[in-house]
């Protein structure tokens, strides 16, 4: 197994650069937008990604120095991958980054300063005595068997300093510099090469259980390709017909209210994301602060098609219930919407309940569940349930675990309608 280790060492370095560093936007990829309707594998619509990939075997004597400013975002991280396999080999989350001298980490304590950081990525060929001289407390070591390294930046809910949505989190992308591992002199960074990250797509397939009336949620296994190891997901999928609605209710994970509460939080962020199983792209999403939800109380999520003949009545009922204080949230899915390939996205929907930095020790953490593999030659997820109390969210987590039922639209609109419980 390939491992990446973090060590914390500091000293001074007075070497001057030998090369002019290019614009960092030219070093990193163009923004891989979660809401761009291009990425597969059900990305979160409120995330942005950038990758820098290079052939390590062509630069055996080069380490990387990544210098940047902490962005304004709910969550920020660096992830490192073996680009030949898509396997995660390490990374560092926002709150783990030691800031530069004179700066503060705004993901640890509230800070209005322009705070900066430096991260080194060092190959296995770099001597320990030279590593000890690097002037940073953030050292990422990459094993010798990695031939092509992909570094990925993730931002969730990036804004500018005023809190307005911003593609880059209100700061420039980090600068990547090359460092000669023998002299520690600054040299030109390795040339970025094409990465497999943009080629990742999820597998499209049909399931008999999509026609079932009940819709259970399972813990997703760790992603095979370029996963965010600091995120956990519950997933479900079903076929929503034009004359029906899908409803699921649960208590969302409680979240910190301030940066100072990040340490020890049950999670940093949650969202509900809907994607098309026809192409594994995401199209509709809602995140914690936008959702009609209250801490410690059940929130209800309703999905119906835009093509439902009683859509206006469904919308009116949801609004009326919200006015009465109900925590209802409505998704209107357009099954005729065309994807980037000109094909309709269809009416078989995947649902992802995402938690970032979930607390594994919390009683109701989704990470305490047993993962259930997606459909494969051995069957569908529901066929693989051998321990319901650990694999089905509503059994493992009680009211904190979602479970869905489909209803005829006519029944949902009755005055005496009541949501079923399991």
PLM features per residue range, with description:
Residues 4-26:
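Bacterial Sec-dependent N-terminal signal peptides
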Residues 19-422:
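A compositional/structural signature for long, glycine/proline-rich flexible linkers
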């Amino acid at each position: 197994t390939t491992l990446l280790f973090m060590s914390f060492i500091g000293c001074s370095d007075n070497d001057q650069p030998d090369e002019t560093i290019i614009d960092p936007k030219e070093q990193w990829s163009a923004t891989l937008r979660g809401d761009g309707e291009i990425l597969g594998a059900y990305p979160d619509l409120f995330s942005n990604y950038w990758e820098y990939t290079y052939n390590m075997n062509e630069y055996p004597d080069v380490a990387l120095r990544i210098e940047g400013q902490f962005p304004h975002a709910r969550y920020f991280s660096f992830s490192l991958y073996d680009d030949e396999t898509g396997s995660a080999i390490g990374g560092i989350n926002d709150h783990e980054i030691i800031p530069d001298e004179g700066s503060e980490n705004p993901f640890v304590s509230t800070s209005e300063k322009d705070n900066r950081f430096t991260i080194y990525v060092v190959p296995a060929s770099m001597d320990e005595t030279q590593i000890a001289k690097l002037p940073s407390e953030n050292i990422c070591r990459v094993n010798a068997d990695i031939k092509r390294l992909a570094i990925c930046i993730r931002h969730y809910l990036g804004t500018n300093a005023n809190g307005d949505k911003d593609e880059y989190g209100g700061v420039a992308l980090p600068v990547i510099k090359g460092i000669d591992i023998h002299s520690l002199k600054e040299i030109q960074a390795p040339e970025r090469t094409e990465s497999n990250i943009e080629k990742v797509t999820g597998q499209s397939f049909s399931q008999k259980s999509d026609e079932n009336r009940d819709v259970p949620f399972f813990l997703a296994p760790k992603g095979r390709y370029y996963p965010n190891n600091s995120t956990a997901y519950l997933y479900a999928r079903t076929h929503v017909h034009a004359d029906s609605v899908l409803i699921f209710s649960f208590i969302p994970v409680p979240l910190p209210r301030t940066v100072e509460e990040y340490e020890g939080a049950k999670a940093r962020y949650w969202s509900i994301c809907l994607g098309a199983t026809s192409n594994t792209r995401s199209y509709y999403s809602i995140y914690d602060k936008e959702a009609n939800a209250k801490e410690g109380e059940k929130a209800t999520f309703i999905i119906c098609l835009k093509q439902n003949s009683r859509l206006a009545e469904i919308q009116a009922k949801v609004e009326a219930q919200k006015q009465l204080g109900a925590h209802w949230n409505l998704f209107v899915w357009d099954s005729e919407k065309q994807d980037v390939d000109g094909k309709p996205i269809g009416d078989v929907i995947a649902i992802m309940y995402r938690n970032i930095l979930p607390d594994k020790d919390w009683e109701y953490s989704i990470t305490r569940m047993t993962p259930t593999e997606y459909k494969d030659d051995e069957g569908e997820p529901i066929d693989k349930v051998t321990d319901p109390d650990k694999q089905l969210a509503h059994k493992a987590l009680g009211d904190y675990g979602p479970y869905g039922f489909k209803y005829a639209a006519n029944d949902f609109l009755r005055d005496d309608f009541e949501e079923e419980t399991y």
